[in-house]
Each structure stands twice: as C-alpha cells, then as structure tokens.
C-alpha cells in the first residue's frame, strides 16, 4: 500500500494568487497577512505572488474563474469574511460564494484553497483571523501548498 500526500514546502517557482474580498477588511487584511506569511515561510517567491482584491465575497467566484482561466497561476488561495447580520443576506452570499468557488476549482481542475470565514459575529471572525483560533488565512495557504505539492507528485 502506498500513501500519497503533499508536502508543506514550495519549490520556489510556483505562481500563486491570493484572492481576497475587501468587505470586512479588518478581518480580511489579517487573513491576507497570514496567507502571505505562510507562503514566504514555506519557500514561496514573493515576486511570484499576486494579491487580487475584490469588493466582497459574492465577487470571489467570478474573479477566481478569470484567474484560473488565465493560465498564469498554479493555484489560488481564496479569502473572505462573511459575518451574519439580521437579514438573510448572509445565507445567500455564503452559499453562492462557496458554490461558485467549488465550481471554478472543479471546472479548471486546479488547486484552490477555501479561506472564506462564515461566522455568526465579529468576535468569531476576529478569533479566526489571528487570535484564539489561529489564522485561517495561514491555514488556507498551507492547504494550497499541500495541494500544489500533491498535484506535482501525481503528475509523476
């Protein structure tokens, strides 16, 4: 029996994008910083890292499809923060963003990591953006790095 898994190390020649929504920027800026830190710590070349900003989480899938379809990137780390309010808006945005991101990843068969927070309140978002619960941006980039490595291994 063989176990095949990715490594948490970049080769240094991977072209990666961090796609981040600006809405709830107090949270998404911290997620983005965590992802950038992870990329650098695990052998990424900053010159091969692009940061792409969109207004909100609903726009993430549209631009993700553009990035993946461009052929310029080996993978994309998607970040955002959708915080529940008093209307059903949260449910619609979180569902459509999630479905759209998954659809784009499968359509292009390329590594995409999901670092979009969906929380009930701002406190939960803060906890997941670098305090009690770690930094989910860092974790999302870790996932992308492992996926990139695994795809390389599976190529042979």
Swiss-Prot record:
The record's catalysed reaction(s) read: (2S)-2-hydroxy-3-oxobutyl phosphate + 5-amino-6-(D-ribitylamino)uracil = 6,7-dimethyl-8-(1-D-ribityl)lumazine + phosphate + 2 H2O + H(+)
Q: Which family does it belong to?
A: Belongs to the DMRL synthase family.
Please name the pathway: Cofactor biosynthesis; riboflavin biosynthesis; riboflavin from 2-hydroxy-3-oxobutyl phosphate and 5-amino-6-(D-ribitylamino)uracil: step 1/2
Q: Which source organism? A: Helicobacter pylori (strain P12)
Quote the protein name from its UniProt record.
6,7-dimethyl-8-ribityllumazine synthase
By its UniProt entry, which Gene3D superfamilies does this protein fall under?
Lumazine/riboflavin synthase
Gene designation: ribH
Stored SUPFAM superfamilies: Lumazine synthase (SSF52121)
Give GO terms for biological process.
riboflavin biosynthetic process
